[in-house]
Amino acid sequence: TPVATVDAIFRGMGTAAAPSGIRLMGGDTCRGERLTLCLTVVGAVGRGKPVSRGGARPGDLLYVTGSPGWSRLGLALLRGGRPSRPSGWRREAMRAHLRPEARWREGRAAARSGAVAAMIDVSDGILTDLSHLLERDGLGAVLAEESFPASRSFRAASAALGVDPLVAFLGGGEDYELLMAVRPARRASFLRAARSFPSGATRIGAVTKAPGIRVRRVDGSWLEGAALPSGFGHFPPPKRRTR
């Protein structure tokens, strides 16, 4: 790997880390057949109780920041060749996939509101990460498609790329938006905090006592179980060999 490429990677990492106050430190460097980066983040929790991915309860309201799914559309676009002068939805899709923004400000404000019981970033897709939010306590969720933040531009991009917008939104991943379980009794406090979110926040469903995730379509039908889009799997089952 050229030294210039490595320098560019570290400059990009520094730019991405700057809003959080994270400082990049040196480490072991060695030669290998391919470029491999191994990163460790070390820090401390300040005053107050940290918000983890555990703690959701039945009846909690589910909110997500930003517009998940754009990164999935960006990947589909780039697989067809990188546009030389992207504009409109093409530029938005490429930005979402190549330069995602961590929601530092939103996370801090949400935690300070005292209304968020559990929180996780959307890196593997909403359905996969929502499962992580619910599985420890054996809970489920009901989501409503009509409330998903899918803009006209998002739907136009999905149609142009041949990607189901529901699949992109629920299973895309690499958006790094925040998915939060909000206590209903403290919803007003959360909404006050959300006014300061640059990315905004949208209510997409609620936590249920019954396990499993169900999605109510706009036409009134339901998606659940194997019919749901799948997100990224870190340990997918091995493919069967065909003779």
Q: How would you label these PLM feature ranges?
A:
Residues 1-25, 30-37, 42, 112, ...:
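Glycine-/charge-enriched secondary-structure boundary and capping motifs
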Residues 6, 55, 103:
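Short, conserved glycine- and acidic-residue-centered signature motifs
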Residues 12, 43-45, 74-75, 79, ...:
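Glycine-centered structural positions embedded in regular secondary structure
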Residues 35-37, 95-103:
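A glycine-rich, Thr/Ser-enriched phosphate-binding loop motif common to dinucleotide/cofactor-binding enzymes
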Residues 46-99:
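Phosphate/diphosphate-binding glycine-rich loops and adjacent basic-rich segments that engage nucleotide
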Residues 50, 74, 106, 130, ...:
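Hydrophobic side chains in well-ordered alpha-helices
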Residues 52, 109, 169:
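Short, flexible, glycine/charge-rich loop motifs used to bind or transfer phosphoryl groups or to couple energy/partner
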Residues 62-66, 99-126:
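Internal active-site segments that recognize and position negatively charged phosphoryl groups
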